[in-house]
Amino acid sequence: MRTLWIMAVLLVGVEGSLFELGKMILQETGKNPAKSYGAYGCNCGVLGRGKPKDATDRCCYVHKCCYKKLTGCNPKKDRYSYSWKDKTIVCGENNSCLKELCECDKAVAICLRENLNTYNKKYRYYLKPLCKKADAC
């Protein structure tokens, strides 16, 4: 409960699905999303882009590609609902755009959990100018 409260404090003022994304990451990984992934590697975080540094960073790269494929919705502002049932994220929207947005966020949260063993603290606050150009999605 304390971790959830800390995450909420760190994400105060965050718009749209970013809040839901943060909750999903916390639920799947047990890590504070802002601290652990807010500026991780070349792709995690709002300003991230570039060739992924490791499998964790690749999760964020694929997530950005997923967002780019969305049509008619704004990942930073649109809000969706989901539930956490039996340690599984269940997207609950009838609106196709919001459902796809939720599925993008669900996929990255699961990917980050599946790649916890690749998480490297040296990439936690990686300098973006050191990132090389990535292939197009």
Curated annotation (Swiss-Prot):
Disulfide bonds join C42-C131, C44-C60, C59-C111, C65-C137, C66-C104, C73-C97, C91-C102. The record marks L127, L130 as: Hydrophobic membrane-disruption site (MDiS). Pfam families: Phospholip_A2_1 (PF00068). One of its GO terms (molecular function) is heparin binding. Residues 121-133 are annotated as: Important for membrane-damaging activities in eukaryotes and bacteria. The record marks K121, R124 as: Important residue of the cationic membrane-docking site (MDoS). Expressed by the venom gland. The record marks K128, K133 as: Cationic membrane-docking site (MDoS). It is found in: Secreted. One of its GO terms (cellular component) is extracellular region. Snake venom phospholipase A2 homolog that lacks enzymatic activity. Is myotoxic and induces a dose-dependent edema in the mouse foot pad. Also exhibits strong anticoagulant effects by binding to factor Xa (F10) and inhibiting the prothrombinase activity (IC(50) is 3 nM). In addition, it shows cytotoxic activity to a variety of cell types and bactericidal activity to a variety of Gram-negative and Gram-positive bacteria. Also induces a very rapid release of large amounts of potassium ions and ATP from muscle cells, which accounts for the pain reaction characteristic of viperid envenomations. This is Basic phospholipase A2 homolog 2.
